[in-house]
């Protein structure tokens, strides 16, 4: 119902000022709002954004401190950690600079591309960074994305997940981190533009361009396709940090082909790179290699910071099993402790587990599934037996014998008996 003064002059529905007392009176469905109330709302929203940013920037650790914390959770990848630490630190310092209003020099956003084999720690690095900075974080799988209007997930749904992670606090969400995995799977299907529409490859890259660069996106709070009549949330993506990751299988061949091309001739050694491993080859990565792989130049341009991760060797996998704060072996030991059971994994068994993961080419990601398979029967039994010791040996890992289960009670009584026998008469 429209509010009127003296049945003639319209008034603001919020502050009740008459039309002649304000500069503008904007009409909505059965309500009016004046320019002064709009300014007040804008100031409130800006203040909320400033407070949210201050909470983040006031607690930003230095790049060296970020690296030190990453070392507690992620094994190896020292160069990637250093690059990420500097990039993230500079990103949030840039936000502080922009918020201060001192814009004599424009600082552009620098999104990040992580390239490395499966299980090398790309996702874990992004997750750990978000924990360190205490900012909203969400992950998306690029393979599930399609262009708007096609069967699949819209890119705006990524922003919806970030909003949910921020508990629908728009100011906090606008300072969050989004990790998009498997970006190598949205590479253009061929190097030449196709006459048919590539809705899950180049089409997704095109759809991601705007939100990665910075735009005010309309985000459907209930998901876009099932509720077309809903009100949209406006989310500014200018200050959201995008980290993309992928294995980029085959890009090493592109790099090798490029680096060997200049040496082709009668005396050329075309197999010069055969002795190099993938990690060494990836260090020679150039932008043109990514273009040839299938990423469009505009998409690569939105990811100015590119870093490669090393393939994990046997020693690194053993370290991952035991050393980090949330090491997998520590987690399983704690799980068994909850059932009054001691878990013992011999060093030779750890080596055998690492060798299995290397053989499967799953990297660190495969370690948990190997351990889960080894310990399944033991976890099934100890919940009822209690007071047990479960020992995993190399033979257990190789499937030659079952996990060795002994009673802790009998072990303690045997020790006590031997101590009594050792006492001289």
Swiss-Prot record:
<dbReference type="InterPro" id="IPR038366">
    <property type="entry name" value="Znf_CppX_C4_sf"/>
</dbReference>
<dbReference type="GO" id="GO:0140662">
    <property type="term" value="F:ATP-dependent protein folding chaperone"/>
</dbReference>
<dbReference type="Pfam" id="PF07724">
    <property type="entry name" value="AAA_2"/>
</dbReference>
<keyword id="KW-0547">Nucleotide-binding</keyword>
<dbReference type="GO" id="GO:0005524">
    <property type="term" value="F:ATP binding"/>
</dbReference>
<keyword id="KW-0479">Metal-binding</keyword>
<dbReference type="GO" id="GO:0046983">
    <property type="term" value="F:protein dimerization activity"/>
</dbReference>
<comment type="function">
    <text>ATP-dependent specificity component of the Clp protease. It directs the protease to specific substrates. Can perform chaperone functions in the absence of ClpP.</text>
</comment>
<dbReference type="Pfam" id="PF06689">
    <property type="entry name" value="zf-C4_ClpX"/>
</dbReference>
<dbReference type="GO" id="GO:0009376">
    <property type="term" value="C:HslUV protease complex"/>
</dbReference>
<feature type="domain" description="ClpX-type ZB">
    <location>
        <begin position="1"/>
        <end position="53"/>
    </location>
</feature>
<dbReference type="GO" id="GO:0008270">
    <property type="term" value="F:zinc ion binding"/>
</dbReference>
<dbReference type="InterPro" id="IPR004487">
    <property type="entry name" value="Clp_protease_ATP-bd_su_ClpX"/>
</dbReference>
<dbReference type="InterPro" id="IPR010603">
    <property type="entry name" value="Znf_CppX_C4"/>
</dbReference>
<dbReference type="Pfam" id="PF10431">
    <property type="entry name" value="ClpB_D2-small"/>
</dbReference>
<feature type="binding site">
    <location>
        <position position="15"/>
    </location>
    <ligand>
        <name>Zn(2+)</name>
    </ligand>
</feature>
<comment type="subunit">
    <text>Component of the ClpX-ClpP complex. Forms a hexameric ring that, in the presence of ATP, binds to fourteen ClpP subunits assembled into a disk-like structure with a central cavity, resembling the structure of eukaryotic proteasomes.</text>
</comment>
<feature type="binding site">
    <location>
        <begin position="117"/>
        <end position="124"/>
    </location>
    <ligand>
        <name>ATP</name>
    </ligand>
</feature>
<dbReference type="GO" id="GO:0051301">
    <property type="term" value="P:cell division"/>
</dbReference>
<keyword id="KW-0862">Zinc</keyword>
<dbReference type="InterPro" id="IPR019489">
    <property type="entry name" value="Clp_ATPase_C"/>
</dbReference>
<feature type="binding site">
    <location>
        <position position="37"/>
    </location>
    <ligand>
        <name>Zn(2+)</name>
    </ligand>
</feature>
<protein>
    <recommendedName>
        <fullName>ATP-dependent Clp protease ATP-binding subunit ClpX</fullName>
    </recommendedName>
</protein>
<feature type="binding site">
    <location>
        <position position="12"/>
    </location>
    <ligand>
        <name>Zn(2+)</name>
    </ligand>
</feature>
<keyword id="KW-0067">ATP-binding</keyword>
<comment type="similarity">
    <text>Belongs to the ClpX chaperone family.</text>
</comment>
<dbReference type="GO" id="GO:0051082">
    <property type="term" value="F:unfolded protein binding"/>
</dbReference>
<dbReference type="InterPro" id="IPR050052">
    <property type="entry name" value="ATP-dep_Clp_protease_ClpX"/>
</dbReference>
<dbReference type="GO" id="GO:0051603">
    <property type="term" value="P:proteolysis involved in protein catabolic process"/>
</dbReference>
<dbReference type="InterPro" id="IPR003593">
    <property type="entry name" value="AAA+_ATPase"/>
</dbReference>
<dbReference type="InterPro" id="IPR046425">
    <property type="entry name" value="ClpX_bact"/>
</dbReference>
<dbReference type="InterPro" id="IPR003959">
    <property type="entry name" value="ATPase_AAA_core"/>
</dbReference>
<feature type="binding site">
    <location>
        <position position="34"/>
    </location>
    <ligand>
        <name>Zn(2+)</name>
    </ligand>
</feature>
<dbReference type="InterPro" id="IPR027417">
    <property type="entry name" value="P-loop_NTPase"/>
</dbReference>
<dbReference type="GO" id="GO:0016887">
    <property type="term" value="F:ATP hydrolysis activity"/>
</dbReference>
<keyword id="KW-0143">Chaperone</keyword>
């Amino acid at each position: 119902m429209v509010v009127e003064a003296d049945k003639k002059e319209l008034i603001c529905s919020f502050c009740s000022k008459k039309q002649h007392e304000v500069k503008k009176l904007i009409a909505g469905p059965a309500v009016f709002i004046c320019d002064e109330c709009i300014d007040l709302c804008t100031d409130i929203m800006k203040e909320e954004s400033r407070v949210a940013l201050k909470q983040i920037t006031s607690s930003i650790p230095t790049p060296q401190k970020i690296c030190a914390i990453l070392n507690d959770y992620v094994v190896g990848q020292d160069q990637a950690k250093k690059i990420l630490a500097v990039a993230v630190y500079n990103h949030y310092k840039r936000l502080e600079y922009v918020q201060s209003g001192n814009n004599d020099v424009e600082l552009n956003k620098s999104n990040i591309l992580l390239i490395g084999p499966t299980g090398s720690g790309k996702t874990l690095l992004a997750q750990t960074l978000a924990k360190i900075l205490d900012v909203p974080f969400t992950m998306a799988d690029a393979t599930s994305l399609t262009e708007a209007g096609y069967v699949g997930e819209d890119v705006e749904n990524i922003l919806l997940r970030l909003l949910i992670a921020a508990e629908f606090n728009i100011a906090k969400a606008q300072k969050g981190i989004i990790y998009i995995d498997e970006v190598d799977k949205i590479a253009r299907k061929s190097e030449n533009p196709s006459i048919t529409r590539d809705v899950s490859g180049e089409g997704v890259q095109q759809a991601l361009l705007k939100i990665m660069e910075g735009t005010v996106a309309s985000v459907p709070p209930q998901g876009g396709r099932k509720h077309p009549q809903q009100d949209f949330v406006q989310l500014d993506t200018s200050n959201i940090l995008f980290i993309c990751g992928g294995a980029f299988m085959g890009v090493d061949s592109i790099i090798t082909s490029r680096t060997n091309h200049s040496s082709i001739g009668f005396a050329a050694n075309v197999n010069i790179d055969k002795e190099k491993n993938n990690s060494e080859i990836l260090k020679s990565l150039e932008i043109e290699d990514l273009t040839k792989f299938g990423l469009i130049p505009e998409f690569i341009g939105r990811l100015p910071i590119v870093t490669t991760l090393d393939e994990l060797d046997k020693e690194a996998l053993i370290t991952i099993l035991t050393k980090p704060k949330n090491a997998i072996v520590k987690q399983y030991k704690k799980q068994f402790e909850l059932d009054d059971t001691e878990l013992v994994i011999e060093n030779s068994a750890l080596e055998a587990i690492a060798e299995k993961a290397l053989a499967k080419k799953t990297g660190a990601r495969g370690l948990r599934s190997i351990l889960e398979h080894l310990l399944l029967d033991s976890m099934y039994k100890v919940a009822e037996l209690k007071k047990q010791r479960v020992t995993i040996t190399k033979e257990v890992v190789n499937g030659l014998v079952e996990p060795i289960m002994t009673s802790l009670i009998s072990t303690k009584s045997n020790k006590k008996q031997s101590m009594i026998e050792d006492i001289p008469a």
